[in-house]
Amino acid sequence: MAKSAAIITFLFAALVLFAAFEAPIMVEAQKLCEKPSGTWSGVCGNSNACKNQCINLEGAKHGSCNYVFPAHKCICYFPC
C-alpha cells in the first residue's frame, strides 16, 4: 500500500511540474493611444466607416466614433 501511495504522489508531482512548464506564455498587450482622425470630416455616425478609414488611410490599429464635446468624432487608435 505504501508503494502505491508513493507512486501516486510521484505522478501527481510530475504532473504539476509538467503543467508549470507547459503553461502558455502571456504577452503583454500593446497599449493604444487615441488621436482624432485627421482625414474624417463632420460628425461621426458610423463606427465601421470610421474604423476602416483609420486603418486604411491613417495606418491605425483601430477606430471608432466617440463622443467628444460637442459632437461624436472619429477617433483613431495607434500604438503608443
Swiss-Prot record:
Where is it localised? Secreted
Tagged with keyword Hydrolase: no
Any one Pfam family here would be Gamma-thionin
Q: Which cysteines are joined by disulfide bonds?
A: C33-C80, C44-C65, C50-C74, C54-C76
Question: At what positions is Pyrrolidone carboxylic acid found?
Answer: Q30
For whether the record's keyword set contains Nucleotide-binding, the answer is: no
Q: Which GO terms describe its cellular component?
A: extracellular region; secretory vesicle
Look up the signal peptide feature and give its range: 1-29
User: Which keywords, in A-to-Z order, does the entry hold?
Assistant: Antimicrobial, Disulfide bond, Fungicide, Plant defense, Pyrrolidone carboxylic acid, Secreted, Signal
The record's annotation in CDD domains points to: Knot1 (cd00107)
Q: What does this protein do?
A: Confers broad-spectrum resistance to pathogens. Has antifungal activity in vitro.
Family named by the database record: Belongs to the DEFL family.
- The protein's name in its UniProt record: Defensin-like protein 14
Species name for this entry?
A: Arabidopsis thaliana (Mouse-ear cress)
Q: Lineage from the top down?
A: Eukaryota, Viridiplantae, Streptophyta, Embryophyta, Tracheophyta
